[in-house]
């Protein structure tokens, strides 16, 4: 105890040197700890999200992109699925079938065109307001409502894909009807609308505003006055879709088969399809994380080299310190301090430095993963 106290007093007198040593050791420990914990947190979040999503059907292409698109609304789907495919799956009775149309954003948040079944499927609860019921209605995720500073009764315009395309589709004004309770998943980031509203955003459906039509002129400038589309009780009945609605696009279809037999039937349905594919997200995510783990193994080897170099440098510093303190140690010996006590003092100094470095590294790694956990839960694509 006396050795620890004396060592502590010594280090307090040399705070800068002690602080540099603590910071160096802590940094060498922090990097592998933070990397391991962050990867584990990401693996847990991605695995949990995938485990609650039995199957995803979408355009044939990158399996990773399709799964991330269906789970996180981030990666872009390489193609589309006709709405008729959704209808066929639902009528086949394989289980619960949910449409997804995710191509646009509103205020930087992904606009998720789906059905009310999605809320039941993900076990999403309303925190405020009501669910979407009409064209143009939207429900915000917990993070989306905070980022957009909106709540029930507010309005939100969709983002233009190309700000310089004045002849392109107009943004659609969405009416916020409710806010979802926080789940800590990608659903917190979404702006949820009915799939028909998503088609209107895509320009596949439109309505007619009679009041504007009566006052309109044929001059080009009259068209440019219009800045966005708005669905109101007065013009809602005029909105319609041209052509066959069964041919309208979806970006993915979520399928929750009732049992293993239905799962096999859905997989077999698309096994030989050249345009569509059915994937099991848990399998794809495991493969994806396997690649991440291999990268982590490479980083672990690098961290081992860094730790070794840090250890050698620390040993050199200790050796030089002993040489610089040789006269000090000799004076202590002449005053009656034995060589064993001197060794105990220097050991106590190293013990304090390493303990402080370990505590600092653990705290920093824990804080980093804690800060990034919500981001990791929604990050993909």
Features from the language model and the residues they span:
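N-terminal Sec/SRP start-transfer signal
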Residues: 1-33, 338-339, 347-350
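Feature of multi-pass inner-membrane transport and sensor proteins
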Residues: 1-13, 43, 47, 54, ...
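Interfacial "coupling" helices/loops that link adjacent transmembrane helices in transporter permeases
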Residues: 14, 313-352
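Alpha-helical transmembrane segments of integral membrane proteins
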Residues: 20-31, 296-316, 353-361
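Hydrophobic, regular-secondary-structure patches
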Residues: 32-110, 117-120, 134, 242, ...
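Hydrophobic secondary-structure segments that place a key small or acidic residue at a functional site
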Residues: 105-115, 125-228
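Mechanotransmission and gating elements of multispan inner-membrane complexes involved in transport
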Residues: 170-171, 179-296
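Short helix-loop junctions at transmembrane helix boundaries
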Residues: 356-381
């Amino acid at each position: 105890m006396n050795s620890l106290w004396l060592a502590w007093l010594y280090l307090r007198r040399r705070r800068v040197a002690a602080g540099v040593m603590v910071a160096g050791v802590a940094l060498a420990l922090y990097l592998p700890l933070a990397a391991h914990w962050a990867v584990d947190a990401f693996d847990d979040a991605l695995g949990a999200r995938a485990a609650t999503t039995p199957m995803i059907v979408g355009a044939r292409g990158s399996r990773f992109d399709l799964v991330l698109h269906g789970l996180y609304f981030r990666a872009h789907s390489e193609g589309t699925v006709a709405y008729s495919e959704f209808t066929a799956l639902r009528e086949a009775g394989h289980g619960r079938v949910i449409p997804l149309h995710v191509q646009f954003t509103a205020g930087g948040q992904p606009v998720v065109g789906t059905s009310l079944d999605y809320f039941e499927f993900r076990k999403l609860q309303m925190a405020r307001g009501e669910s979407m019921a009409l064209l143009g209605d939207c429900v915000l995720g917990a993070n989306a409502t905070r980022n957009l500073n909106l709540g029930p009764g507010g309005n939100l315009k969709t983002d233009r894909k190309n700000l310089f395309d004045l002849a392109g589709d107009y943004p659609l004004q969405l009416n916020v009807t409710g806010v979802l309770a926080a789940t800590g998943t990608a659903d917190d980031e979404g702006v949820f609308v009915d799939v028909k509203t998503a088609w209107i955003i895509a320009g596949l459906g439109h309505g007619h505003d009679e009041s504007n039509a009566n006052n309109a002129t044929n001059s080009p400038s009259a068209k440019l006055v219009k800045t966005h589309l708005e669905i109101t009780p007065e013009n809602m009945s005029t909105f319609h879709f041209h052509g066959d609605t069964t041919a309208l696009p979806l970006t993915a279809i979520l399928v929750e088969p009732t049992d293993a037999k239905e799962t096999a039937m859905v997989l077999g349905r698309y096994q030989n399809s050249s345009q569509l594919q059915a994937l099991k997200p848990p399998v794809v995510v495991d493969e994806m994380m396997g690649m991440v783990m291999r990268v982590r193994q490479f980083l672990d080897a690098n961290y081992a080299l860094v730790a070794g170099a840090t250890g050698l440098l620390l040993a050199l510093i200790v050796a030089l310190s002993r040489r610089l303190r040789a006269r000090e140690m000799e004076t202590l010996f002449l005053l009656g301090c034995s060589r064993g006590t001197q060794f105990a003092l220097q050991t106590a100094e190293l013990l304090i430095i390493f303990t402080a470095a370990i505590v600092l590294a653990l705290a920093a790694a824990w804080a980093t993963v804690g800060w990034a956990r919500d981001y990791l839960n929604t990050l993909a694509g």
